[in-house]
């Protein structure tokens, strides 16, 4: 093989075609399951089990969606999930903004150690925290309440949100908030009037991450709540299956209904989320 051929091969392997292929694989891997769930929600039980398996429904029906709302209190599940996720996100953002600002601006003696601990805590498997969290919630008398989910969800989302916001705050020039403080603004005032508005993409990114994390969580919602009126969507969806029956079209319809709010949220704020994920890594 000539030197020119070797150079061309290296360019192809390390250039745009390889990156495009990797991106395509990731997109297909993420979209195919969602597409299958969407199409299944319009199929009948008989059509789903027929051979050979077909992707597109022969006679699309909305009956599964009507049944999803009639078989279980799906609206109640959606409301509970939305309120828990919203309140958890607000609390997470407030705490993570303060923590990230301290890490980004204050000359903390053990800053590197704190950052390392934040990263380490974020890697803990949720199942290892289940018993301690359950005992804590029981001791506080918070079981079967929204608070029993809001507090753990906040704690679980804080590490990632703090890291995202710390990186973003570090990219904002100090001169802007210093000028505000010279004009009589307090440090808290400079944070919420200057830094947070400039860091809006990062704040939106952290908020989306916290909201989705709370919206999708199943284990804690199942373990900390036995009140049917307070069940969240992930726990409610598993109630559609019977002891010997798995109505996959109805379950798929309920899943689609649960995906729609998050999908709308991401579509609306996608530009801010993308800029928040990328701009935080730029200094100056």
Stretches with model-predicted labels:
Residues 1-13:
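Short, Lys/Arg-rich, polar N-terminal cytosolic tail immediately upstream
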